[in-house]
Each structure stands twice: as C-alpha cells, then as structure tokens.
C-alpha cells in the first residue's frame, strides 16, 4: 500500500507531489497529459490586483511561500522556471496616478508597489501618463515545470498516463483501491476534470475559458511585464506572450477568432510597432463563485480530498493550498473556512 494517489498533474498536482516528496511519502500520479490551465496560463506571480490596485487574498503570505517553493523545484528538476521582472501598469489617466500613490501607502502593498510613477521611455509603447511599477514580481514557466515534473515521475515509474475512471475507484477499510493500486488517500487536483465526478457535484465549480497569443515583435525590446488591459510578457528572442481573455460563456475547446480580435484590439492600444502572431492557445481555469480556492477532505468519504478552484492565481495559491491540505490530512491542522470545501453544502 502506498500513501497517496494523485489525480491530475497541473500546478496543484505538482505542488502536492512536491510536498509529499519533501515528507518522504509514497505516491503515484494519474494524468491524461492533455492541455490544462497550467500549460496555457501566463504564470504571473503578483500579490496585487492591478484592476483595483489592492492586495489579493493573503497576497504577501502567498508570495513568501510560493517563490522558495518553486526555487526548490528548480533545483530538483535542474531547470530555470522562475523569471523575475517588474510589472509596469499603464496609467490610463491622471486619476490613476492618485490611486497608485494611495495604494503605495497601504502596509500590505509597500513591499511591492513603487510610489514613484515611472516615465515611459519605450518609443513603441503608448503610455503618456507613465507607469505604476510593481517590484519583486515575475512569472513562472508553468508549461516547462509541468512537463519536466512529468518526465521525472515517468523516470521513477510513478506516473500513469491515462484518463481517470471514477467508476473504478473502490473504498476499502484502510483507504482506496484503483485497479491494482491500494492507497491510504486519493487527492483530486485535476482542475475542470472534477466537474464530471458525481462525488463532487455539490461544489459549484465553473469553467472559465482563457486564451492568449505569442507574438514576435522586433521593435518592442521590452523586458518588463506591461499591463494595460492585457499583459505583455517577454519570452526572449523578440517573442512576447499576450493575454489573457476571460470567457464564462464559451465552453468549447480550442481557440476562437473573437478572442484573437479582443486581444489584438487591446494590444494595438498599447504598442505601435509591427508584429506577427506566432501562436494562439486556449484552456479552462477552474473557478468558484466566490473566487476562492476549494480544498479539503470530502465530507462523506474521508479517504478522498481535493485541491481546486485556483482560477488565474494558481502560481501563488497552489503551493499554499497544497501545504494546507497536507498538514490537514497528516496533522489535523484546520483549513481556513474561506477556502474549505465545507463552505459548500453537501
């Protein structure tokens, strides 16, 4: 018998697996290897909600935990996936400058918000009122991280590449059985895949579609992350990631021309240089009505638990939530009610 079965290898799955490895727990992962939010997301780590210039839920705490966590994964996987870059928010009007100065005085923001407005010196970026600058920010190459972690598990023969069959899961006196595998616990971290599992139908998970593009723009020459309705993230070699859209109505797989038009419209308001589109990708983020993660042990089946609802802040939230769930299962540490699965009526 092993300690854990993990279903799904996105950011939440990788985070929980890494926590298990750090605590010498045995586990296997079941994952179908198809596109997930972790493979198409922007990967930004930023504790400030730029639309309102306010700290996100537990932002400083999440930042303090997430970056060392990913750094330890870099060592294990022998990769570089953490990329530091300031975020420059375009000040659309003079009133934005006052809001920015006010935000810089909030205690939870001081470590990240520069009080001084940065003047625009890039000739192809439209920012007549300058930028509000965030420091200690950047992005994680989540696609690389998930890919390399998958290879690591394959080399250790602890990855089963298959679609999880919910009907094949059996409950035993000491845990669960799935095929020939017996385990003390099974943890579901498969994002929107959880929606089709009847055992979790009481959780109001939603599929929120996001699309982004990768462009090539030789004249942009910008290393900072630019935000002005969309993010522009430098990938090197004159390539930039542009995104992302949020669509609650479109449930179809694949990219859309409407999303491309929306991204291009916003991008053309920011830059005046010629560019061409290299690729466009789409994925679904799992979200909840209150925009909070959902983690914990199933109210009826104590052998099964979940980490889900990361939304667009999975890079920051996944390591934190993985740690909370592990400590809850192994040590009985309470999970905060605002992200506890028990906030939804079973």
PLM ranges: what are they?
Residues 276-346:
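C-terminal catalytic lobe of FAD-dependent flavoproteins
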Residues 44-123:
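Dinucleotide-binding Rossmann-like beta1-alpha1 core, especially the glycine-rich loop
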Residues 53-65, 132-148, 254-259, 316:
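Short beta-strand to alpha-helix junction loop
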Residues 1-10:
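Beta1/beta-strand and adjacent pyrophosphate-binding region of the FAD-binding site
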Residues 12-19, 23, 32, 43-44, ...:
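Active-site substrate-recognition segment that forms the wall
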């Amino acid at each position: 018998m092993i300690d854990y079965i993990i279903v799904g290898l996105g950011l939440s799955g990788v985070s929980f697996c890494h926590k298990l490895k750090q605590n010498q727990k045995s586990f296997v992962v079941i994952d179908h290897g198809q596109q997930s939010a972790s493979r198409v997301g922007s990967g930004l780590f930023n504790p400030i909600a730029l639309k309102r210039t306010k700290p996100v839920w537990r932002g400083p705490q999440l930042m303090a935990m997430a970056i060392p966590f990913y750094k330890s994964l870099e060592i294990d996987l022998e990769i570089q996936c953490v990329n530091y870059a300031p975020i420059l928010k375009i000040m659309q009007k003079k009133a934005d400058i006052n809001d920015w100065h006010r935000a810089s005085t909030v205690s939870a923001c001081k470590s990240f918000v520069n009080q001084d407005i940065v003047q625009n010196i890039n000739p192809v970026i439209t920012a007549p009122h300058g930028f509000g600058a965030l420091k200690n920010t950047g992005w994680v190459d989540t696609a690389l991280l998930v890919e390399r972690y998958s290879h690591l598990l394959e080399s250790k023969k602890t990855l089963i590449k298959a679609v999880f069959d919910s009907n094949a899961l059996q409950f035993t006196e000491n845990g669960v059985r799935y095929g020939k595998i017996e385990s003390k616990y099974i943890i579901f971290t498969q994002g929107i895949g959880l929606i089709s599992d009847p055992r979790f139908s009481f959780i109001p998970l939603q599929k929120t579609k996001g699309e982004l593009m990768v462009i090539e723009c030789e004249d942009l020459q910008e290393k900072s992350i630019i935000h002005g309705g969309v993010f522009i993230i430098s990938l090197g070699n004159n390539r930039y990631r542009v995104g992302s859209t949020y669509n609650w109505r479109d449930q179809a797989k694949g990219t859309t021309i409407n999303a491309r038009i929306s991204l291009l419209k916003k991008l053309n308001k920011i830059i005046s240089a010629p560019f061409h589109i290299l690729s466009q990708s789409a994925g679904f983020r799992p979200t909840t009505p209150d925009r909070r993660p959902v983690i914990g042990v199933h109210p009826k089946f104590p052998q099964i638990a979940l980490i889900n609802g990361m939304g667009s802040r999975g890079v920051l939230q996944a390591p934190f939530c993985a740690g909370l769930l592990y400590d809850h299962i192994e040590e009985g540490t309470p999970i905060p009610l605002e992200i506890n699965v028990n906030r939804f009526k079973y």
